[in-house]
Amino acid sequence: MLLYTPPKAAENIPVIDLSESPDRAAKAIHRACRETGFFYVSNHGLPAELIAAQFETARTFFNLSLDAKMALHMKQAPSNAGYEPIGLQKLDSQDKKTTIAPVDLKESFYCMVDLRVDHPMSQRRIRAYGHNQWPQDLPAMRDQTLRYQAAVRGLGDRILALLARSLDLAPDWFEPYYQMPVSTVRMIRYPPQPENAEFNQIGAGAHTDWGGVTLLAQDDVGGLEVRNADGDWLVAKPMPGTFVINLGDLMAR
């Protein structure tokens, strides 16, 4: 039985070692989710080589010409798969009635749940599922990204089991709701801040993620900040060998 107590503000983002006992990890996750909704996981089991290869794949893709990337624009796909250029997203929702927030300074490539064109979910044109777009000049990108997607999906299943334990539920409690999840790999590039950037224009504005759980691999540049229960911003510095985990709106509700 879990008794409710008001959350208190975290002073840092905890690192949770997944090699520890499930009960101990679940207890740490419970506290982290109440205080920030964010935590790192270490000893997660994904090979460092696989993660490094995915970062290299992303760098290679974003170094393609703009014409080559625009040929894979996500708007031309039946799903949300493909390239999203700079200027299409504006995440900061603060006071939109009186303030026009600048667009985010980032470009992205989305890999959705890869289904055949004749799959029923593709036929229903649900944009979270469908045939992915891949650049012809990077033949290895598809297999590498799908391997990474499968590995991270497995880690996500482990996180869901620990979240269930943290709520005194059976470890498989979430499984019926995640038989076919929206398992998206999103590669993001944040270019250097241009000299003509608008006031308060940054890579990604303040926001919450809409899904269940986000698993984020960071490079060594940094920039991510997390707001705690008191409204203070904490720096989520890059930590080699970890993923940053955060609860999305779906799980928080």
Locate the predicted segments by residue:
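Peripheral, non-catalytic segments flanking oxidoreductase cores
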Residues: 1-253
